Each structure stands twice: as C-alpha cells, then as structure tokens.
Amino acid sequence: MKKYAWIGLVLICLHAQGQQITFDIHKTYQTMHSFGASDCWSMAMIGKYYPESKKKQIAEWLFSLETDTSGTPKGIGLSLWRFNIGAGSFEQGQASKITNEWRRAESFLTGNTYDWEKQKGQQYFLDAAKKNGVPYTLGFLNSSPVQMTQNGLAIGSGKLAEWNFNKDKIDAWTDFITNVSSHFQFTYLSPFNEPQWDWGPGKSGEASQEGTPINNVDLAWATRRLAQKFQQTNTKTRIVISEAGQLNYLVDTKSNRPSQDGQIDDFFSANSLNNLGNEPTVEKVIAGHSYFTTSPTSRRVALRQAVGKKAQEAQINYWQSEFCILGDNAGEIKGNGVDLGMKTALYVAKVIHADIHDANATSWSWWLAVSANDFKDGLIYTFNGSNKGENDANKYDADLYDSKTLWAMGNYSRFVRPGMKRIEASITQPDCLITGFTDQKSNVFVLVNTGNAFEMNSPSQHVIKTYTTAENQHLTFQSVRNGKIQVPASSVMTLVIQSN
C-alpha cells in the first residue's frame, strides 16, 4: 500500500480500497457562520405545558455540545436559534381565520402595552439555547402585528405581492420590532418571510398560518425604515432579508413573480433603486429557502451554483434559512408521512451538501425543530401513541422521538463550528459526497455515503475521530489510529483530524 503523509499540513490522501480523499487546507472558500432550526410552532405548546424532563431532553438534543461516557455527542450543537415573533392571531382565536390554534401566535404588544410574558413556551427554548451557549439568535416575523395590518388579521388577502400592512403604521412597526429585538437581544432580525406566496385564505375561508406577501419595492422601503430606526436607537441587532420562498427567486428575473424576483441584484446592486447594501444595520446576507428546488440532482446543483455565483458577484453571503421535505421532489421523496430513518436523513444531507458546496452557503437552517405532524418536517417528533398531529392529544404531553435527520444534520452542526473555513476536498468513492472544513486546529470532513460500505486506511501519525449516523448509529464515536475506517452503507460520517 502506498503511503501518503501530511505535506506541510496542506495535502493528505486516505486510501480507500483504490479510492481516496484528497484535501488542501490552503484552498479555501466561505467562512461558516451557523447551523440552526426554528421554534415554530410546537414549542409554544411544549415549552408551556410539557414536563420539565422532556423539555430538557429536547434542549439537550438540539443544543448540547457535551458527549456521553463513550464519546458520542448528546446533541447536535446548533449555533443559531430562530424565534418566531407572533402577530397576535392567538389572541383572536377562531376570528383569526387560522384553522389550528397551534399555528396561531401570541403578540408581545396589546394596544400600546408590552407583555413580555407572552410566547412563554417559546421563551423557554430561547433561554435554553442561550444557556447551552448557542452563539446566535434570530427573531423572524411571518406577519406584522394585527393592529398594523390592512385587514386586521395576520393572514394575507390572497392576492400575490399585496402586502397586508397599513403603511401609516410604519413608525409603530419599526418601534415594535426595535423593542422586541432589544428586549431579547436578538443577534439578527428577519422582518419578512417567503414574500412570494400569497398567504391568504383557502377555499374554506381560512388559512394555515400567519403570513403576508410583499413586493421588492415595499420590502426595500420597510427594511430601510427599520434599518434607520436601528441606527437611531443604537440597536445591536442586524437585519437579514429576504427569506425567499424558493431559491430561483434570488437569481431569476423572468419568473412567475415579476415584482418579487431577482432579489440578490435588486437588494444588493449599487445600481438598484431598492439597494440595501449601504444600510449599516443590514447584514450583507441574502436568505432563501431550499424548498421545491432539490430534485432532480441536476436542478439542485445548477440552481445553487447560480445562487453562489450571483451572491459572490454582489459580495454578500448566502444563508439557506429554512428547509424540510415538501412536495414530491420529482418522485424521489414525498413530504407526507413521518420517516425517522435514513432515507430522509440522506436526502437532507445531500441538500445540506449542495447548499454548502455548490451555493457556498455560510448558514444552513432546518424548519421545525420539533413536529407533531405526520410529515417530514421535524428533527424531533412528539406523538401520543399513534395519535399524530397538532391537536389536544399532543398538546400537554407526548412521547419524544429523535430522527436520523436530527443526527445527520448534527454531522454538520456539531462539528462545523462558526468561523471554520470550507476547504477543497474530494473523494473518488462512487456515490459519496464530501465537504471539508478547517479552523487550523482541526480539519473536519463530512461524508454523505448513499452507496455501499467501504473502508479507508487512516494515516499512522494521526488519530482520526469518526462520528457516524446510520441505521443503528447516531453520531456514534470511534477513534482510529493506523487502522481502518469503516464507512457504512447509507450513512453520514464526520471525520475529525487534529492538526499537529
């Protein structure tokens, strides 16, 4: 067997039965910022009603950086926590026209008075994130407070691009967001969510959640006013836009949403009337959601390469800020039906890989941290027996289930820490994807193996720590020196190599 060694801490090859991993720590790409998830919507119920032991278990799975006695991580160590700032639909009850109470959200503002005891269940997990050392928090709105909207509700009119907002209330809106951001000391604030969808009532006359569309002109105007308010009040929170509903709306200028597309150029080009790049309190970031663009592989890769190229030209970072399995994804995987196993985990890992490797995402977030739904939308699930759904049976207490998707995301989030740089890395093993990262103290590699099992010989002069998520493993730790690294079939593996 031909031996490969470190060459000035630049290049290493690990032989794998004729295959090899090669990487170069001097060829770097983006600097990683964070991995996150959101508290919608179940945390409102869980944090308020569930037994303390179960709330602590959820917090440990999501936030912990500790290991058990065998060296296996207790949690996935998220570095970003997304907190939904409610619009007041919960207080409206059925009059909100939002069908399910789980999807309604309280508001901190009643009249001119703030009640910081509202959204108490969500606050439990926001506090837990901070106590566990999560470095970044982000508050996001799906709708403006109902007292500031055109229709007095937290849902849209049903017309595309029609912002459900009374523009005479813009000062009250900036005051509200500034006060909430300052009170909770959010690192970031996202004022709009998936502006391309209509968020109106369905045929039943009711909607499924809070939300409003908005066109690029109005989004830029409102964001500029908010940015100025943050600057005037010395608010430390940074503004993040635009949470596009699909990634094509970031780059495409001839889409089916003509007043809501081409958002990278529109918001960050010096020649655009909607340019926000010069606002000191607006983060040089464009946020988008990976829904409906992940299958087939050719579309997943090509679109992300376009996003990465456009973001680089605009000199901004790209954040993938929300994803779960929706739709039928070209027949590859359907959103309906819970899957706690590796099929969904591997699909999600391929999406994470594409966003980071092809689009140069610096941040990647999942949608629902905890779900009660019979749907592929959670990292953790809460059910009472076979009773699935956002209902009274699961409202006050239920059994908890960790998914392989949780742990596969942890193969990234637990080890690819804020400030690490992505480096050049490749593997010749068929059906295996790889990304590499370094902080000069250690080098981290995440392998997404959708094919057969294989072995790699580790170099004798380095201890390699492996963490594997597979059918019978969840971030399971093994230390290897001068031995063979077993990469299981259908697995996600993280390799950590300490630099000398």
Which residue ranges define each predicted feature?
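Glycine-rich tight-turn/loop motif centered on a GG-T
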Residues: 163, 205-215
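Catalytic metal-binding/acid-base residues of hydrolase active sites
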Residues: 195-196, 245, 287, 291-292, ...
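Short glycine-rich, flexible loops that bind phosphorylated cofactors or substrates
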Residues: 90, 295, 373
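Aromatic/acidic polysaccharide-binding cleft in carbohydrate-active enzymes
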Residues: 317-410, 424-427
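Glycoside hydrolase catalytic-domain groove-lining segments
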Residues: 115-117, 124, 235-239, 276-331
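Bacterial Sec-dependent N-terminal signal peptides
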Residues: 1-19
